[in-house]
């Protein structure tokens, strides 16, 4: 392999942040060579032009793959992996940025000295794009220097807002993911999947130990619309549904069926129901019922009440009015405090 580390950067319509992302990678000081593999997913703004400028400026480091049509995050990510030359893989999204110039150095040293470790990840902070401030991320469930990976799989399956492993902080062995892609590609590239990190994290945890570094190495961008966050109820419904389907398949693959997974799928059914409720959309409600059946989820009491309301149009409309009143009261309270 030509390079020891391949850093994957996926980007789409991120002309305001992609330069920041690439600069944060190029500042890395590491004793092994690295390359940057950019998957530019057919942006409609100036993102591609910026990426081309960086490729021309750093021809020995940056390789740009400009997609002729939009692939979506999952196919774009795994296509970039297949184009990578490194023994180790890292990634950084086109709106996030690394903050520690020794990130790769710290991580590759652990992988070189611990053959049983399949992945190293670190602490990270949230970055508010509106006021340009950084904030500590929530507490992590596994902060020991090294954890046996199989102990983490259930938590990875049932993670919700905070990832057990923030993949943009990670460095992992390419041999494991390349072998898995060659043997069971559909487990990673299913068109219905909503993200790429769940299956990678579970795979690495199933193949060995996971190392953790408490140093903050990433600013995770928040405040704008992303693949995983949208103010549009239909978009958010679709994302949560697809990601939960991934979790269900991972649970089946690793034969994990526990009270924790049951609570998780039950809660996700409730969340989908709430998206349908707020959108006042009966098709979304029908899809929620189907998800509940497919995921074999236990119906929680709050979900029973929600579905009862939504089965009666008058109750549903009344509930929406009541919710709007509460939202306005909360907004007024925030303004007065």
Locations of the language-model features?
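Membrane-interface aromatic/basic loop that binds lipid-linked glycans or pyrophosphate carriers
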Residues: 2, 273-337
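Short, well-formed alpha-helical segments that are part of the catalytic scaffolds
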Residues: 14-27
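A conserved acidic beta->alpha catalytic loop
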Residues: 40-49, 69, 93
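Glycine-rich, basic loop-to-helix element that forms the pyrophosphate-binding segment
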Residues: 67-84, 106
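Short aromatic/hydrophobic "clamp" motif used to bind/position activated sugar donors
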Residues: 89
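Conserved donor NDP-sugar-binding/catalytic core segment of glycosyltransferases
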Residues: 102-137
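Conserved nucleotide-sugar donor-binding catalytic segment
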Residues: 140-234
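Catalytic core of nucleotide-sugar-dependent glycosyltransferases
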Residues: 150, 192-193, 216-224, 229-259, ...
